[in-house]
Structures are given as C-alpha cells and as structure tokens.
C-alpha cells in the first residue's frame, strides 16, 4: 500500500443496516491483513438500534454487530460516532476494547437523536473526541463543536440527569484536541515529543473593555471565533498557512 505520511486509509462501513455479513467479513480480512483502523457510527437513535437488533438477532447490543467481525477496538483501532444511547454492556465493551467515541453534538441536535452522556464517558475513562458529522451538521469547525458540546451537556444536566455535571471549557478543549488526536498518535498537545499540529488564533477582532485571563480569551474564541480568526496553521511542524 502507498505510505503517505499525513494521509492514511481507514475502513468505513457506513453502519450495520447498510452492510451485509459478507461485506463485514471481507472488511475484517482487509483490516487484519493491513492493520487498518475502522470508523463507523453507533447507537445514534432508538430507531436505528431497534433496526440493528432486528437485522442481527444474535447480538445483545449494537456494538456486538461490529465486534462479532473483530471490528470493534482491540487489535482494530476503532472510532465510533455518536454513542447517544449506548447500553451499559456496550459502554463496558467500548472501554475494554479501547474504542474511541466521536461526539457530534450539532448533528445529534439537528437530527433530534438525543444527547450523548459525555460526562459519564469522561468519568469512566473512555476515549472521546469531537466530530462534526457534516452530513448532519452545518459546520466542520472543531471550535464550534466545542461550544456545542458544552451547551448540550448543560441540557443533559438540566433535563436528563442532574448528577451529570456540564462540561467545562477545559474538558471540551481537551476533547477537541488531545482527546481525539490521540487516536492518530502523538498529536493534539504541546507536550514534549508530540508533533506540532496547531493553529494560531487572533482574538483582536473580538474586542472587549475587560482585562481577560488566557482562559477567558480561549472561551471567547470557542464561542465567538470563526475561520477568519485563524492566522496560521502548522502540520507536523511545517507552516501551511
């Protein structure tokens, strides 16, 4: 296979209802041969979960529809989008297998899928990052995803479970950087030994008469900035903008 430094292939079965057993078996063979990662989506809404159960009556929960083909973490690095309504058994298997969750708050809101219990995932030590799921969202901005994640976590706390505290700015920022970046290796952090993948943001276009701390400035950028605030981009230490 072609070895590109910054662009790598990933297996992407759309979701269980659109994939035959024969296809999943073949994907499993390809994964084991080339040691590829896999991405799909999981437990996004109740209708989908019921549909998967109907199609895969031998499974106890949605995640088993992937794990029965060895496509659910472990030796197969896996990202699962959404995980809005994952059962206790499914969550336990995701944690055991090291499955990454891509939280897509804007998509989940637009499609009325529900609110993912992100606080639980963080507290239980699952790997979780942020996604846009642009097919169901309106923006590919990870800063926007951070703001959306904080906002929907407040709704979950207020409307669903008052014991699940809303996300902090720091937690949302972590999810949008190292939380998801760690799936790809040592990216998403300024720690020693990590690749310098970064953007430079200029907040001078968001004026305020107040004296702000670095955290305050970051929070304003998360909520108020857009691509016009990006003044430079670096990939693996190389400036590309």
Regions picked out by a protein language model, each given a short descriptive name:
Residues 195-241:
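C-terminal cap of metal-dependent C-N hydrolases
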Residues 1-83:
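Metal-coordinating catalytic core of metallo-dependent amide/deamination hydrolases
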Residues 11, 41, 80, 94, ...:
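Divalent metal-coordination and catalytic microenvironments
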Residues 68-74, 119-207:
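His/Asp/Glu-enriched, well-ordered alpha-helical/loop segment
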Residues 33-34, 97, 124:
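Helix C-cap/helix->beta junction micro-motif
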Residues 80, 88, 108-115, 139-140:
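C-terminal active-site-proximal or functional interface alpha/beta core segments in diverse enzymes
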Residues 86, 90-99, 104-109:
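Long hydrophobic segments that form regular secondary structure
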Residues 44, 105-109, 134-136:
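Short, acidic/turn-prone active-site loops that include or flank metal/cofactor-
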């Amino acid at each position: 296979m072609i070895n590109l430094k910054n662009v790598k292939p990933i297996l992407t079965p759309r979701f269980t209802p659109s994939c035959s057993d024969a296809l999943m078996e073949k994907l499993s063979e390809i994964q084991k041969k080339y040691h590829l990662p896999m991405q799909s989506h999981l437990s996004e809404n109740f209708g989908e979960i019921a549909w998967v159960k109907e199609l895969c009556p031998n499974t106890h929960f949605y995640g088993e529809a992937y794990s029965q083909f060895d496509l659910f973490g472990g030796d197969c690095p896996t990202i699962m989008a959404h995980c809005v309504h994952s059962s206790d058994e499914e969550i336990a298997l995701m944690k055991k297998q090291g499955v990454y969750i891509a939280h897509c708050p804007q998509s989940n809101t637009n499609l009325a899928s529900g609110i993912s219990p992100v606080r639980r995932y963080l507290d239980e030590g699952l790997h979780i990052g942020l996604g846009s799921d642009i097919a169901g969202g309106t923006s590919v901005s990870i800063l926007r995803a951070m703001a959306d994640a904080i906002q929907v976590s407040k709704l979950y706390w207020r409307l669903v479970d008052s014991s699940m505290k809303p996300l902090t700015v720091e937690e949302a920022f972590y999810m949008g950087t190292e939380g998801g970046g760690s799936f790809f290796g040592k990216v998403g952090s300024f720690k020693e030994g990590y690749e310098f993948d970064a953007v430079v943001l200029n907040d001078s276009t968001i004026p305020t008469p107040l004296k702000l701390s670095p955290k305050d400035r970051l929070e304003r950028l998360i909520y108020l900035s857009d691509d016009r605030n990006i003044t430079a981009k670096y990939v693996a230490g190389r400036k590309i903008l």
